[in-house]
C-alpha cells in the first residue's frame, strides 16, 4: 500500500536524505543547469511505514512543464506511473501545452518507461553529459549496465 502526497507535505530532511541516498546529492545536473530536487515542486509515494518509495520533481515555466527527476525504489509496481500521472494532472491544471524531460542514453529502463506512456523523442544532445559533469563531477562516466553515460535525450508529450 502506498499514498501519493505533495513534496511540501514531507519533512524537508526526508527529501534531502532520499536524494542523497539515491543520487549522492539532492542536486540534479543536466545541461540546462543544476536543480535542487529537495526544493522543487513534486510528489512522493510513501509506504505504510512512512518511507519514501518514489519521488517525482518538476518545474512549470509558462506553457512547459519539465520533469526534473523521477525515482521509484520498487519497479513494476505502478509507483512511477502514479507519480507521473500526478504531474501530468498538475500540468493540465496549469494550462501547460507539453511536458518535457531529459534522460541519459544509458537509462534504458527510463527510455522504455516514457515511450510506453506516450512520450516521444524530441531531440538528442550528443555529449551533453560532459557539460552536466562539469557542473556535477560526481556523475559517473559509465553506468552500472556498462553503457557510457554520454548523451542526453529530450522526451516530450503534448498535453490534450
From Swiss-Prot:
Protein name: Uncharacterized protein YdhI
Species annotation: Bacillus subtilis (strain 168)
Disulphide linkage map: none
Classification via PROSITE patterns: GNAT
InterPro entries assigned: Acyl_CoA_acyltransferase (IPR016181), GNAT_dom (IPR000182), N-term/lysine_N-AcTrnsfr (IPR051556)
GO molecular function terms listed in the Swiss-Prot or TrEMBL record: acyltransferase activity, transferring groups other than amino-acyl groups
Record domain N-acetyltransferase: where: 2-140
Top-level taxon in the UniProt lineage: Bacteria
Pfam families to which the protein is assigned, alphabetical: Acetyltransf_1
